[in-house]
Amino acid sequence: MELPIRLVVGLGNPGDKYTSTRHNIGSDWLDRLADAQRVSFALDIRFRGLCARIVQSDTDIWLLKPQTYMNASGMSVGAMCRYYKITPEQILVVHDELDLQPGIIKLKSGGGTGGHNGLKSIVADLSTQVFWRLRIGVGHPGDRNQVVDYVLHLPRREEAALIDEAIDHSIQVWPLIARGNFAAAMQQLHTRQEN
């Protein structure tokens, strides 16, 4: 058992035109968690983001959707961590992952940024790569020159269905993640996808 999660960050770009795009999958995931927990987001200018609070096992857990655009997400995350004295090991960042097929979700701690500007910004602000990531597969366009256009568009219908199903399953696994029972959470997330 590791430290419980105290901050969940859903990466995405602000504005209606980005809603449900591949790059906003993290933000969309956080909306689903907030709905399941029956909480609403409110803008908090201290953290440059939309925030909500849930309580799990007597622990306050903050939900944060940075409103800074992806490449400045670290400012929002860092501000909240400093204010609430949250360590990097207590953070879960939910983001789109080009290296995973739609419908695949992987949980891991640390690692590189894979070129993801939101992760780069968070790593730069926290001065560490050691935080938890929930990587939601969106697939790859096959040509790195098409990545920017690809992530800023909606997934195809069949991809969206796979992503939705995987998100639903990961929300069911959320209590394990929140408590810091990452081994059990990974087993449930990763084993299901191999079947």
From Swiss-Prot:
- Which residues are tagged with the site Stabilizes the basic form of H active site to accept a proton? 96
Which Gene Ontology cellular-component terms appear in the entry?
cytoplasm
Reaction(s) catalysed (UniProt annotation): an N-acyl-L-alpha-aminoacyl-tRNA + H2O = an N-acyl-L-amino acid + a tRNA + H(+)
What's its top-level EC category? hydrolase
* Keywords, ordered alphabetically: Cytoplasm, Hydrolase, RNA-binding, tRNA-binding
- Fetch the SUPFAM superfamilies from UniProt: Peptidyl-tRNA hydrolase-like
Annotated GO biological process: protein quality control for misfolded or incompletely synthesized proteins; rescue of stalled ribosome
| Principal location | cytoplasm
Site entry: Discriminates between blocked and unblocked aminoacyl-tRNA: 13
UniProt: tRNA binding residues: 18, 69, 71, 117
Per the record, the domain of life is Bacteria
Q: EC number(s) in its UniProt entry? A: 3.1.1.29
> Annotated Gene Ontology MF terms?
peptidyl-tRNA hydrolase activity; tRNA binding
Tell me if Transcription regulation is a UniProt keyword of this record: no
Q: Where in the cell is it found?
A: Cytoplasm
CDD domains to which the protein is assigned, alphabetical: PTH (cd00462)
Active site, renumbered: 23 (proton acceptor)
Assembly and partners?
Monomer.
Which HAMAP family does the entry link to? Pept_tRNA_hydro_bact (MF_00083)
Q: What is the stated purpose of this protein?
A: Hydrolyzes ribosome-free peptidyl-tRNAs (with 1 or more amino acids incorporated), which drop off the ribosome during protein synthesis, or as a result of ribosome stalling.
The cross-references to PANTHER family, in alphabetical order and at most eight, read:
PEPTIDYL-TRNA HYDROLASE
Family statement: Belongs to the PTH family.
Show the NCBIfam families listed in the entry: pth
Q: Can you say what this protein is called?
A: Peptidyl-tRNA hydrolase
What is the taxonomic lineage of the source species? Bacteria, Pseudomonadati, Pseudomonadota, Betaproteobacteria, Nitrosomonadales
